[in-house]
């Protein structure tokens, strides 16, 4: 019985130390995502001089033909809103990661709405429109609504 007790205590100690990982890498990654988007959006705003922004939010995809459809959609919004800078993002983390890895073709970097909303706010756009391109309301749409409410 004593050996079992000692073994369990040692096992618990090993598991405890293993679970106490420092999360600096993920914190740094989040800071990097915000910084990268802030710089890109600020550069776009400085280049265009526009004070309105449109953020298009799709669930996402990893297929090249879907990327072409997203590009066409963004272009249609740019044509419809010539006085606004148009940004595009994915709400699905899985699609963001797989698109970045180039799972089914070219690699594309898309970001979560919260990163672009932060960057748009930091760039001091006066008017921001957020348009969901979600086909059905799900968890990602609820997350988008929550992110917009925090931003407002």
Describe every region a protein language model picked out:
Residues 1-8:
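Bacterial N-terminal signal peptides that target proteins for export
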Residues 10-13:
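Short, linear, compositionally biased motifs with a strong N-terminal bias
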């Amino acid at each position: 019985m004593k050996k079992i007790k000692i073994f369990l205590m040692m096992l618990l100690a090993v598991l405890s130390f293993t679970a106490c990982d420092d999360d600096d890498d993920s914190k740094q990654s989040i800071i990097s995502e915000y910084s990268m988007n802030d710089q890109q959006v600020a550069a776009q705003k400085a280049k265009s001089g526009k004070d309105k922004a449109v953020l298009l939010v799709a669930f996402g995809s990893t297929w090249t033909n879907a990327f072409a459809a997203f590009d066409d959609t963004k272009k249609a919004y740019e044509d419809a809103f010539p006085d606004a800078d148009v940004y595009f993002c994915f709400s699905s983390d899985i699609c963001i990661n797989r698109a970045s890895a180039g799972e089914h073709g070219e690699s594309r970097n898309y970001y979560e709405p919260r990163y672009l909303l932060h960057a748009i706010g930091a760039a001091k756009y006066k008017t921001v429109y957020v348009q969901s391109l979600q086909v059905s309301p799900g968890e990602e749409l609820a997350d988008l609504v929550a992110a917009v409410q925090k931003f407002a």
